Each structure stands twice: as C-alpha cells, then as structure tokens.
UniProtKB/Swiss-Prot annotation:
Lineage: Bacteria, Pseudomonadati, Pseudomonadota, Gammaproteobacteria, Lysobacterales
A molecular function (GO) term: argininosuccinate lyase activity
Gene: argH
The name this protein goes by in its record: Argininosuccinate lyase
GO cellular component, one term: cytosol
Subcellular location: Cytoplasm
Keywords per UniProt: Amino-acid biosynthesis, Arginine biosynthesis, Cytoplasm, Lyase
Length: 431
C-alpha cells in the first residue's frame, strides 16, 4: 500500500491493523470515484479563487483530473488495494504527475467532507433513477388501465374472493402508487441536494473558501451551511434516500406477490413472457417465475441496508469511523433495488391476462355487496340489507354479469369512474 496520508514520521503501521482499518473502502470507492474527481476539480477552482493555487497550477490539476477520469473509465487506472481509499488515490496520482500542485489539492478540505460530497452526488444520481423508473412503471400501468378498463377480474381481500373488480382498477392502483413513489424520490432528491464540500472535518477551516462556487459548479441547489450538521447528515441523508427507494420496492414486492399468485396453476390469471421465467434442474415440466420471486425479495435488501445505517447512527455529533460502513449498505441496497426496478416496466408491459380464467373465478357470492347496496339505496337500512344479502349470497349473481357490476361501480376511483385523466395529469406533472 502507498504511504498513508495520515501516517506520522517514525511510526510504523501494522499491516493487519491497516487492512482492518481500510476494510473494503478502496473497492467501494470505485462507485464514488468519478464524483470524487469532479468534486476535486471544483475544490481546486475554489482554491485558485482565493490565491492558494496559481492559474497554471489549476490548469494542470484540471487537466490531470480529466485524464484520471478518462483512464478510470477505460480501465487504464485501477483503484485497488495499493491505495488506502479513493481520496488517497486522487492525491497520489496528482502528486506523481504534478508535484507540489498535487500536494496542494487537499488544502482546506478533509476526507470527511470529500466523502460527504461524493456520496451526495451519488445519491442524487440514484434518486433521479428511482424517480425515472417509478414514472416509467406508472406510464405502463396508466396505458394498460385505459386499454383494459372494462376487463372483469376477481377482487380479493384476505386472499379470498370478495367482489367483481377490473383490470383497469388493478392497473390504476399501481399507477397511482408509482406516481407517489416518483414524487417521494424527487422530494428526497431535493433534501439531499445540499453541498457539504468546504466543511472540512466538521468544524470549518481558517480560509475564506469559495463555497458558493463549488455549490454551483457541482450542480447543487444550495450550500449545506453548518459544518456540524454536514457531519450529522451523514447517514441521515443516506437513510432518507433508502426510504425513498424502499417506497418503490415495497410496492414492487406487493405487485410481485400478486403476479406470483396470478401466474400459479391454481389461479392461472396471467401468462408471463417466457424470458421472465426459468426452468428446473430436475423437473422438465417447470416454468418458474424466478424473476418476480427475486423482485419480491428485493425489498428485504433495501430494508436491511436501512436497518444497518440506523444502527450505525447511534453516535454523538462529529465524525466517527463507524460511518465508513454505511457505504456498503447503500451500494447493496441501491444495487439490488434499482436492478429489480429496471426490469419492471417491460415485465408489466408484456404480461397477458387470461380472460377465460378470470371470468371462471367470478362466482355468485361476489355480487352480494352489490345486492346489499342496491337494497340500501331503495330504503332498506344497510345492516338489514347486509344480513339479507349474506343469507342469499349463493344466489346473488342470478341475472347479473361482471360488466353490469363494473358499470354500477360509480364511486370516484372505482371501475366505472377510474379518473385516469386525473392520474395522467399527475404523471405528466412529474416531468
């Protein structure tokens, strides 16, 4: 490993201790590395503004940072265990190429605010993708709700047949859910869109740093003013981002549950595209819905990441090395969550309803609620109407059709009044 930035003269660092301290840091920092480079460029510009760097030194630093980013993307520069972390790698590379100009890059900053700003940029990018994917899911659901608004399907409570419903209602429910998920991700993006660069180790520095410049250069909406709060927000903002992701994966889990049931032989309501199924290593007859089962499991990874960070945050104010462990949690949570959400729009667009199976699952008792409500409209107290309908539930469907039941469901949001135009307007407002 290269010399450590913090190593004191004459003090040897035990290799086992150093390996423990580093953990997976340098590997995890590959995710942040391009953001760390971008923040280093903005910081260098700020240092030139206050006279720490000359114009020539700044030009050299910006040139070498750009080359480093290109080399990293192309695989010519590998961030590996010869470096303590990504921050050390950047400084080592600049020092190797530029000498004293590279040694000046860390003036006025700490690795504490360096990782904060790189993480913040990474979280903004991931939250934008959560919002985009949620909007894509909502669009598919809205389009299918419109196309299949009159297709009868059985509605369930307690996984028991309840009332006649429609594919339009089912799709509209998911559309509204993912519109809300997109809004949640967008709102969380606004929360984390605050620049911590320039807060150093959490107490500021005795330099008039141009934080307004770095805020604008890195595309942040605002400066995070208090150095104390900058450190307090580490973990807190990651937690908020995971909660926004978790809102989407929670709905993903429930839609995957529906599809797990609907695709089973016992239900048979839905046919999945072949590319979303797998086979068995021993049973030649099997088509397993592995994709939706792994989608269903995704929320557990997101929830686990959130729990890990919550436990790490049992700390007093200021920076603590415990927070290093938050990086692996957010990488794993967002990695699993986004991978599953990426597949969802296409899956939903290509599933097929089996009309014959859907109609066969609508039995006479599923009209009993209609009978009770109709009697109440005619003047019978609802509780009496309910009891009468319950007694005659087995014959409630006589002379009735699923289409007739759906046409009578006129309460706002129900089958005969889906309010798809209102939902589409909400979806359009996302852009």
């Amino acid at each position: 490993m290269a010399d450590l930035l913090w190593q004191k003269p004459g003090v040897a660092v035990d290799a086992k201790i150093q390996t423990f301290l580093a953990g997976d840091d340098v590997i995890l920092d590959r995710e942040f590395f391009l953001h760390d480079i971008a923040a280093s460029a903005a910081h260098a510009q700020g240092l030139q503004h206050i006279g720490i760097l000359s114009a020539d030194e700044l030009a050299g630093l910006l040139r070498e940072l750009d080359v480093l980013a290109q080399d990293f993307r192309a695989g010519r520069f590998v961030l590996d265990t010869q470096y303590e972390d990504g921050h050390s790698a950047i400084e080592a590379r600049l020092t190797e190429r530029l000498g004293d100009a590279g040694r000046k890059i860390h003036t006025g900053r700490s690795r504490n605010d360096q990782i904060l700003v790189a993480t913040r940029l990474w979280l903004k990018e991931k939250l934008q993708r959560v919002a985009q994917l949620s909007a894509e899911v909502a669009k598919v659901a809205l389009d299918r709700a419109q196309a299949e608004k009159d297709l009868p399907i059985p509605g369930y409570t307690h996984i028991q047949r309840a009332v006649v419903s429609s594919a339009g209602m089912w799709w509209a429910g998911w559309a509204e859910a993912f519109i809300d998920n997109a809004i949640r991700a967008r709102d969380t993006h606004a929360l984390v869109d605050a620049n911590p660069l320039g807060t150093a180790a959490g107490y500021g520095v005795n330099l008039p740093l141009d934080r307004e410049h770095t805020t604008a250069a890195l595309g942040f909406a605002r400066m995070q003013i208090s150095p104390i709060y900058a450190q307090l927000s580490r973990g807190k903002f990651e937690l908020a981002a995971l909660e926004a992701l978790g809102a989407a994966t929670l709905d993903l889990r429930r839609i995957a549950w529906d599809l797990s049931l609907f695709t089973s032989a016992e239900f048979g309501f839905v046919a999945l595209p072949a590319q979303y199924t797998t086979g068995s290593s021993i049973m030649p007859n099997k088509r397993n819905p592995d994709v939706i089962e792994l989608m269903r499991a995704t929320h557990a990874s997101v929830a686990a990441a959130r729990t890990e960070i919550e436990q790490l945050l049992s700390l007093p104010s200021g920076y603590h090395r415990d927070l290093q462990s938050s990086k692996g949690a957010i990488f794993h949570g967002f990695g699993r969550g986004l991978a599953a959400l990426e597949l969802l729009p296409s899956l939903l667009a290509n599933l097929e309803w089996r009309d014959d199976k859907l109609r066969a699952a609508i039995d006479s008792g599923m009209y009993a609620t209609d009978v009770a409500v109709e009697a109440a409209v005619a003047g019978v107290p609802f509780r009496e109407a309910y009891k009468a309908a319950a007694a005659g539930a087995d014959s409630a469907g006589q002379g009735r059709t699923p289409e007739g039941s759906l046409a009578a469901r006129v309460s706002p949001g129900s089958a005969a009044d889906l309010r798809l135009d209102e939902l589409r307007a909400r979806w359009q407002a996302l852009s």
